[in-house]
């Protein structure tokens, strides 16, 4: 055990120097400068972003005391790494999942404007979910599954 410890002590100066070098090589980000025309265009897209997405209104979460045969639980992994869960009725439209994910995405306006897609993962495979499908959670096979949100 002492050999491992002495080896780590000998390597520590190199690790510290490498991390400082990497930190100094990182590019300093400067804020973008926009002209007045570009800023007007971004304001127009910001106002219409909700209309473009057109997600349905998200109803309240069903009570967990309800019959479990009519409920399904969905776990969603967000792009920032968080995992969130919500219950839906199996008879509800899958489109509500997009509304739920959109409501959980960060508060920054830049993230709110970004388009995303939903992916259901299987061992060794995955399935893209499409907003246009009018299927229910039960019909789509999403009941009690994990869905990932990824940026387009």
Curated annotation (Swiss-Prot):
> Region Disordered: which residues?
32-61
- UniProt cross-references to InterPro entries, sorted A to Z: Ubiquitin-like_domsf, UBX_dom, UBX_domain-protein
Q: List UniProt keywords, sorted A-Z.
A: Ubl conjugation pathway
Q: Does the keyword Signal apply?
A: no
Report domain UBX positions. 67-150
Under which name does UniProt file this protein?
Answer: Plant UBX domain-containing protein 12
Q: Per the UniProt entry, what species is this protein from, by scientific name?
A: Arabidopsis thaliana (Mouse-ear cress)
């Amino acid at each position: 055990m002492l050999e491992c410890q002495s080896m780590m002590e000998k390597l520590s100066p190199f690790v510290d120097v490498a991390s400082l070098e990497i930190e100094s090589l990182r590019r300093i980000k400067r804020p973008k400068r926009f002209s007045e025309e570009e800023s007007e265009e971004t304001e127009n897209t910001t106002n219409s972003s909700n209309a473009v997405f057109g997600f349905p209104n998200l109803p309240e979460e069903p009570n967990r005391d309800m019959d479990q045969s009519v409920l399904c639980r969905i776990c969603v992994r967000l792009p920032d790494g968080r995992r969130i869960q919500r219950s839906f009725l199996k008879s509800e439209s899958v489109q509500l999942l997009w509304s739920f994910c959109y409501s959980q995405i960060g508060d920054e306006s830049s993230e709110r404007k970004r388009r995303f897609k939903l992916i259901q993962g299987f061992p060794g495979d995955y399935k893209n979910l499409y907003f246009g499908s009018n299927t229910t959670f039960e019909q789509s096979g999403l009941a009690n599954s994990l869905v990932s949100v990824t940026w387009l």
